[in-house]
Amino acid sequence: SGTAPCTRPSTAARAAAAWDMGALAAQWFSDFLGQPCRLVRFDPEHLRLSSKKWTGDLDAHTQFADGFAVLVTSEASIDDLNERLVAKGHEAVGVERFRPNVVLGGVDAHDEDRIDGVHIAVGQGDEADTAELRHVKPCARCPIPNIDPATAQSSPAVSDTLSTYRSDKRLDGAITFGMNAVVARGAGQMLRVGQRFGAHYCFD
């Protein structure tokens, strides 16, 4: 074994330090996907900061994510979207189209927009602790949610429907769904389905 060479993949016009996982992995993925590609992992020594415009006094690190390490949405938000889609004669979609890390239950549709922090009970028994996510920026949506990840088929129905009710003045009218968040406390803790959480609501 040995250390693979460091490479700098480019994604969405950004560069990030990464470790190439070698020729064997590259060949497997190239054969499977039918096009030349490399498998890389982030360089743990490379620290990339999320925008201080949104994180304020918190130095929040991210790696290959678009701009922030965590995306939070809710079951009620995707249910609300699906009700609108079905009412227009379209099929319901899964929340995976929006690629969230955390999906909240027990809140109203788009309450994640009105929450500035989530405290999640992590650990078990005497080791119980709390992880804190700070919601910092609405997530402006590109056309990717229009694509069915199971079939790669694309339809404008999702974007067209979101555009009727999800224009966000905080981002100059951009269409948003979900909130970008950063880890304020509890980095390295494990999140699991069903963990209890508390939220701080804020209203402008």
Regions from the PLM with identified roles:
Residues 1-204:
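Metal-cofactor-dependent catalytic cores
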